[in-house]
């Protein structure tokens, strides 16, 4: 049985790992997951990430905590395999009035909603992180 939505699985592993106060979570790696992890690291939601293994690469995310509380308060999948959500540059949402981020897959790669607005790009909204 193959996994239907690997990105939702990644987000769930992050959510569950932080709820259980884990230091790190591992998952099967892909280019899109690495790109999402890179955005989360740049925005300060995770400490670090690394890819290990040649035949079956594993992505390991080091989770981030501040004063014993998880940095990621909520992480929510938006576009899913059964219902893709695309937005034009003018329609890009602001998560929690700008306090959170929307991770967006554009023609220039995966980036935050702020970066997409500055670049004048729309795309598929992968998830909201706050």
UniProtKB/Swiss-Prot annotation:
Signal peptide location: none
An example molecular function term from Gene Ontology annotations: rRNA binding
Alphabetical keyword list: Ribonucleoprotein, Ribosomal protein, RNA-binding, rRNA-binding
Any Pfam family the entry gives: Ribosomal_S8
InterPro entries: Ribosomal_uS8 (IPR000630), Ribosomal_uS8_CS (IPR047863), Ribosomal_uS8_sf (IPR035987)
The UniProt record lists the keyword Oxidoreductase: no
Gene3D superfamilies xref list: 3.30.1370.30, 3.30.1490.10
GO BP: any one term: translation
HAMAP family from the UniProt entry: Ribosomal_uS8_B (MF_01302_B)
Assembly: Part of the 30S ribosomal subunit. Contacts proteins S5 and S12.
Family: Belongs to the universal ribosomal protein uS8 family.
NCBIfam families according to UniProt: PRK00136.1
Protein's job: One of the primary rRNA binding proteins, it binds directly to 16S rRNA central domain where it helps coordinate assembly of the platform of the 30S subunit.
Name under which the protein is recorded: Small ribosomal subunit protein uS8
Organism this protein belongs to: Cronobacter sakazakii (strain ATCC BAA-894)
